[in-house]
Amino acid sequence: MISLPEKFLEDVKVILQDEYEEFIDSYNENKTTGLRLNTMKMSKEKFQKLNLFDLEQIPWTNEGFYYDESVCKPGKNPLHEAGVYYLQEPSAMSVVPKLDIQKGDRVLDMCAAPGGKSTYILSQLDDTGLLVSNEINPIRINALGENLERFGARNCIITNTDSTRLRKAFTGYFDKIVIDAPCSGEGMFRKDPVAIQDWTYSKVLECQSIQKEIIRDGYKMLKKGGILVYSTCTFSREENEDVIEEFIAENEGAVLIEKERLWPHKIKGEGHFVAKIQKLDDEDCRVKEMKLKKLNN
């Protein structure tokens, strides 16, 4: 089995308790790989009739499939270069469906590179509405632009700025926002040895500080009644529940609709955390405040 950081193992054991050994055993298994169909370019029925690869449906997304990279190489097929599908880690495909995207929505992907969430959002918008894909890293933004162009983006704007400047330009503008936050990358351990080497608990706390700033700015760009989905590919409570719980406590108009952890010993995927938050309108805020007063009396 791969060697994992001791502090990481201690923290996961506290979270999982009786499931800890099962989680550790999952690191003896191969990483999972997936592809997600671009339904703007090809229907699911037509794609499956091509029978190009040995595919298995991913249960949490209609457009996603598992594939075995030891048997097939979808990344080398011309359809990949044509933007008919996007290669994406399977558990990462659980995020965008939580947005409940409707045609015509104005959507923001705050931490967009390399484009997994943005390309998925585009296929859901189906050439309607607007997607703003933001990436603060000027190096990573090149890959984002290439992937969006390959996917056939026509209703998309790419921005390269921090969350504070973005918030000043788009206050209260978006129907839906996704924050796939920069994180310590613990969900990458099984597929990327460098992620293990780079991990420190200091990095966890550093990421937490950045995440808190991003979600605060993101929420201010959300319309009343809008949906914000926060996600990470890490397991630490500090970067997941702690960030969300503090944020909800600070914002009386924010309601946690659902949160979900995808663990590699429970699902076929590398692991993810997803939280769905709604911004209440003024009337709903008043109702919430009245209910809290009744509970406190």
Task: Name each model-derived stretch.
Residues 1-297:
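S-adenosylmethionine
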